[in-house]
């Protein structure tokens, strides 16, 4: 009797195991994408279907049932490589596996994996508020925004295969944006982030990635010390070097400046006094600024020490109040765009001054000519005193003689020459015995 019971139990267990695959039982496999489910257009991704018992074969299924030719009617072994990836590959995937002892029986569908293809729109921008250096236990807001009206934004951290975080975009002041809250900050959340945007009708076709943003957690290690050589107060043009040091065996030091968007890093060097130090040359001093430094280890590049005490570097003999970041060019080099604007403005001002001078000169000339032409032709009029001033140093007096014949030159001013020849002829002669500037008039 007992033998019969045991036999029936074994048969029942066998039937349950046989029915499981056909009925879509609990033998659910696990589908993963490597290296990431976020794939640039033209890139590659490998889909793998895992199960606690090794599958001989598996099949892929796409949620939207848009058949890609390479999928149709094919059975794959272990993994499937998509390359090159196109927008047609974007979508939601599942897999089913077959059992070695049951080639016709398939497992239940796996977990879904969403393949997102990037590079279909212009990249958005990614910012950290209040900043990318976050103290352990605090929170940071990563804001993704664009002037393209994206309906959804995605935030993805490098090195992880899980689906990116997704938020609905909010439109404000002509831009679309989403705020991703990260925290409480810990080492697992630190790393390099990028964000993407998408529109409603193609939710799995994303924009190009934003520029990478490194989020660093600070505070796990003791702070280093920061000093300035030759000192924190220097004359304008004097060279300055900032030294970051500690007795902790840091592999790397990082120098940051308040208000600066970037940091500068240098490897630590062991000194004879058993300290580890890095010297940051800043070059000739032109401005002032407040600096801090951090230490980090090679095995954990996104985990930094507490910041050093702030060091204020001031420059005497220079009215400027802030010093450019070590990674930013000196202000003396100028901004090429601003330089072009300055040159263009100067040229316009010079041309305006020249035009104004020309118009003023033309106006004065016309006014002078009009005054001369308005004078009545007086027969009993002396020559203009200005004519006498333009002659030789010896003053000469002219007399107007009517109907006299002399061998002197005939003078007719071009500005007073009438269009029709006059009937009378006026001759001028020099009178050497006349008094200077006197006027002798001969009446007819």
Curated annotation (Swiss-Prot):
One of its GO terms (cellular component) is plasma membrane. It is a single-pass type I membrane protein. Residues 315-334, 375-394, 409-444 are annotated as: Disordered. Residues 1-21 form the signal peptide. Disulfide bonds join 49-95, 144-195, 244-293. Keywords: Cell membrane, Disulfide bond, Glycoprotein, Immunoglobulin domain, Membrane, Receptor, Repeat, Signal, Transmembrane, Transmembrane helix. It is found in: Cell membrane. Belongs to the immunoglobulin superfamily. Ig-like C2-type domain 2 mediates specificity through recognition of the Bw4 epitope. Residues 42-102, 137-202, 237-300 form the Ig-like C2-type domain. This is Killer cell immunoglobulin-like receptor 3DL1. It comes from the Eukaryota. GO terms for molecular function: HLA-B specific inhibitory MHC class I receptor activity; molecular adaptor activity. Receptor on natural killer (NK) cells for HLA Bw4 allele. Inhibits the activity of NK cells thus preventing cell lysis. Glycans are attached at residues 92, 179, 273. SMART domains: IG. Residues 361-444 are cytoplasmic. The chain crosses the membrane at residues 341-360.
């Amino acid at each position: 009797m007992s033998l019969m019971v045991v036999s029936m139990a074994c048969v029942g267990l066998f039937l349950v195991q046989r029915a499981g695959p056909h009925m879509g039982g609990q033998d659910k496999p696990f589908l993963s994408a490597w290296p990431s489910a976020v794939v640039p257009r033209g890139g590659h991704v490998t889909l793998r279907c895992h199960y606690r018992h090794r599958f001989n074969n598996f099949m892929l299924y796409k949620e939207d049932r848009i058949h890609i030719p390479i999928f149709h009617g094919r059975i794959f072994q272990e993994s499937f490589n998509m390359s090159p990836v196109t927008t047609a590959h974007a979508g939601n995937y599942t897999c089913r596996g077959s059992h070695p002892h049951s080639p016709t029986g398939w497992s239940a569908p796996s977990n879904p994996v969403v393949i997102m293809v990037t590079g279909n729109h212009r990249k958005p921008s990614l910012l950290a508020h209040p900043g990318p250096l976050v103290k352990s236990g605090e929170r940071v807001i990563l804001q993704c925004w664009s002037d393209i009206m994206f309906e959804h934004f995605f935030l993805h951290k490098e090195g992880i295969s899980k689906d990116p975080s997704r938020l609905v975009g909010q439109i404000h002041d002509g831009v679309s944006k989403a705020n991703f809250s990260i925290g409480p900050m810990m080492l697992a959340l630190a790393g390099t982030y990028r964000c993407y945007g998408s529109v409603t009708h193609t939710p799995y076709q994303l924009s190009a990635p934003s520029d990478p943003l490194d989020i660093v957690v600070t505070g796990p290690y003791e702070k280093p010390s920061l000093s300035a050589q030759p000192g924190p107060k220097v004359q304008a043009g004097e060279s300055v070097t900032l030294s970051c040091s500690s007795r902790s065996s840091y592999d790397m030091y990082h120098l940051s400046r308040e208000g600066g968007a970037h940091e500068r890093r240098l490897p630590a060097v062991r000194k004879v006094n058993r300290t580890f130090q890095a010297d940051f040359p800043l070059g000739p001093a032109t401005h002032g600024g407040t600096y801090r430094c951090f230490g980090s280890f090679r095995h954990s590049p996104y985990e930094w020490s507490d910041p050093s005490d702030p060091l204020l570097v001031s420059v005497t003999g220079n009215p400027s109040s802030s010093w450019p970041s070590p990674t930013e060019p000196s202000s003396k080099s100028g901004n090429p765009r601003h330089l072009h604007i300055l040159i263009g403005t100067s040229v316009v001002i010079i041309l305006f001054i020249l035009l104004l001078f020309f118009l003023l000169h033309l106006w004065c000339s016309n006014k002078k000519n009009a005054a001369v032409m308005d004078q009545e032709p007086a027969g009993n009029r002396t020559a203009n005193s200005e004519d006498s001033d333009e002659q030789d140093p010896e003053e000469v007096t002219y007399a107007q003689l009517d109907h006299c014949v002399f061998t002197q030159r005939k003078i007719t001013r071009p500005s007073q020459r009438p269009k029709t020849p006059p009937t009378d002829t006026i001759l001028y002669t020099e009178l050497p015995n006349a008094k200077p500037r006197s006027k002798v008039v001969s009446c007819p």
